[in-house]
Amino acid sequence: MALPAGPAEAICALCQRAPREPVRADCGHRFCRACVVRFWAEEDGPFPCPECADDCWQRAVEPSRPPLSRRLLALEEAAAAPARDGPASEAALQLLCRADGDPLCSACRMAAGPEPPEWEPRWRKALRGKENKGSVEIMRKDLNDARDLHGQAESAAAVWKGHVMDRRKKALTDYKKLRAFFVEEEEHFLQEAEKDEGASDDDELADPADRFRSLLQAVSELEKKHRNLGLSMLLQ
C-alpha cells in the first residue's frame, strides 16, 4: 500500500532517490511504486523483495517454505562478480547493470541522471544462466544424436551402393552373353539361308511359296529360341 515517506526512510532501495508513491514490503524496505512495478514486470509470482529477495508474502501462504534468499544463495554466489572499483558491501551489489553485466552500486545509481540505469537482481541472472546451461546441454545432446544418425545413414548408403554395383556387374555380364548368342545365331541363320538359296538354284522348278514358308518357319524358330534364352537369363 502507498505510504508517506518519513524523514528516516526517505530513500527508495532501488533508485536511491526520494520515493514517489512509496510502498513498503513486509521486510521493511521502501520503494517507489514505479520501481517495484518495473522490477516485477517479468515475474509471474511469487514476488520477492527487490532489495533482500525475501519472500515474506509467500511465507504467509506457505509457512514451511524456506526464504527465497536461502534457496538461491548458491546461484547468487555463482553469478556474483567483483565490484568494478574495489570491495563493497553485499547489500550494495544486489543489482547488475544490463548494459555491461557489472555490479551496480548505490553511487552508480545515484549518479545515473534523471533516468535510472537498466538493472536486474543477481539471483534472477543466476536463474537465467542456469536455464541457458540446460538449453545448451539439450542442444549438445541433439547434435550428438544427429551425428549418430548421419553416421548410420552413411553406412547404410555404402552397403546399398555395394549391392547396386554387384547387380550392375551381373546385368552387364548377362548382356554380353546374350549378345554373343545373338551373333552366333545370326551367323547360323545366314548359313542356313545360303544353303537354301543354293538348293533353290539347283531346283529351278521349286515352288516360290514353299520356299517362303520354309524361310518364315526358320525365322519363327530362331525368334522363339532367342526369346526363351533371354527369359531364362532374366530369371537367373
Curated annotation (Swiss-Prot):
Pathway: Protein modification; protein ubiquitination. Its EC number is 2.3.2.27. Signal peptide: none annotated. It catalyses: S-ubiquitinyl-[E2 ubiquitin-conjugating enzyme]-L-cysteine + [acceptor protein]-L-lysine = [E2 ubiquitin-conjugating enzyme]-L-cysteine + N(6)-ubiquitinyl-[acceptor protein]-L-lysine. Keywords: Cytoplasm, Isopeptide bond, Metal-binding, Methylation, Nucleus, Phosphoprotein, Transferase, Ubl conjugation, Ubl conjugation pathway, Zinc, Zinc-finger. It is found in: Cytoplasm; Nucleus. GO terms for biological process: positive regulation of cell population proliferation; positive regulation of DNA-templated transcription; proteasome-mediated ubiquitin-dependent protein catabolic process; protein autoubiquitination; protein K48-linked ubiquitination. Homodimer. Interacts with JUN, independently of JUN phosphorylation. Interacts (via C-terminus) with TRIM7. This is E3 ubiquitin-protein ligase RNF187. The lineage of its organism: Eukaryota, Metazoa, Chordata, Craniata, Vertebrata. The gene is Rnf187.
